[in-house]
């Protein structure tokens, strides 16, 4: 059976449980990601860091905070923070309402594709197939 070329799912933000690991169900091979809901006063039980993986933390709903190398940083809704591998981190909720985060992680490639400076360097444009977008 051939692997799917794409995978689609729907996760209503208000239905997110404590932690929803989505990488495997989505068939991801190079990106790890999850949705996390912390109730007031909840958060990671310990700090951690990585050898090579960087992470991106996005506050989707509510206001929480992240501790980076011992410094607490507020994360109101819409905040996006990239954290390098060696930084100790812990995510939590010190507010009075639930907070929902998206967490993404990836290991850098040994070499960026096609000599580019980003992973987008392996993009193959087809300018003959331009999608039409309709106003609603």
Language model regions located:
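Short, small/polar residue-rich loop motifs at catalytic or cofactor-binding pockets
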Residues: 30, 51-52
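Ligand-binding loop in jelly-roll beta-barrel domains
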Residues: 27, 65, 85-111
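Hydrophobic/aromatic beta-strand elements that line small-molecule binding cavities or substrate pockets
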Residues: 35-36, 79, 89
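Conserved short histidine dyad/triad with adjacent acidic residue
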Residues: 19-21, 34-50
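A short, N-terminal "cap"/entry segment at the start of jelly-roll beta-barrel domains
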Residues: 1-31, 116-136
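Glycine- and acidic-residue-biased ligand/ion/polar-headgroup-sensing regions
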Residues: 52-54, 58-64, 69
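Short acidic-glycine-tyrosine-enriched beta hairpin
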Residues: 70-86
């Amino acid at each position: 059976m051939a692997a799917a070329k794409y995978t689609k799912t729907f996760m209503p933000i208000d239905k997110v449980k404590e932690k929803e690991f989505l990488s495997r169900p989505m068939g991801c091979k190079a990106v790890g990601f999850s949705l996390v809901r912390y109730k007031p006063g909840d958060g990671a039980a310990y700090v951690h860091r990585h050898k090579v993986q960087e992470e991106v933390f996005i506050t989707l709903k509510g206001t929480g905070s992240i501790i980076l190398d011992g410094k607490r940083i507020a994360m109101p809704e819409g905040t996006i923070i990239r954290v390098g591998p060696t930084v100790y981190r812990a995510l939590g909720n010190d507010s009075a309402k639930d907070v929902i985060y998206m967490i993404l992680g990836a290991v850098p490639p040994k070499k960026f594709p096609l000599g580019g400076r980003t992973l987008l360097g392996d993009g193959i444009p087809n300018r003959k197939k331009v999608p039409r977008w309709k106003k609603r």
